[in-house]
């Protein structure tokens, strides 16, 4: 009797730890994806579609039918280029609407973290501005 109670408590704690680890993993994953999109944006010519594809597929021109990393799609990525051609030229890459499912049956449902964004100054990549 006591061992079944302890086993249930252990399983609840274990699944809770796994869910927390999953949240941390996806937080880091999305943070790194927007960072890589911002890095791509500052060293290449500005192309919002290519930047969104780098974030979602890790490739500026993915093959047709390619699925995004962990369900991420280019439509979840927004790219903003502000103050173009000035010293305060910035690129903002943002991911919104990403949905993840919990492992735990008690937290069944969809969790939408974020939004995640990264802003980077455009350096010009050696081009005259």
Task: State what each model feature region is.
Residues 1-57:
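Alpha-helical assembly-interface signal, strongest on the long, hydrophobic N-terminal helix that forms
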């Amino acid at each position: 009797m006591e061992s079944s109670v302890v086993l249930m408590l252990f399983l609840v704690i274990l699944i809770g730890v796994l869910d927390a680890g999953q949240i941390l993993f996806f937080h880091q994953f999305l943070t790194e994806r927007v960072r890589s999109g911002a890095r791509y944006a500052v060293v290449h010519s500005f192309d919002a579609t290519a930047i969104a594809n780098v974030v979602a597929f890790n490739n500026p021109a993915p093959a047709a039918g390619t699925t995004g990393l962990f369900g991420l799609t280019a439509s979840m990525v927004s790219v903003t280029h502000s103050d173009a051609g000035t010293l305060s030229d910035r690129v903002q890459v943002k991911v919104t609407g990403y949905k993840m499912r919990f492992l735990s049956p008690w937290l069944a449902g969809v969790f939408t973290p974020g939004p995640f964004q990264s802003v980077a100054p455009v350096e010009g990549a050696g081009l005259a501005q």
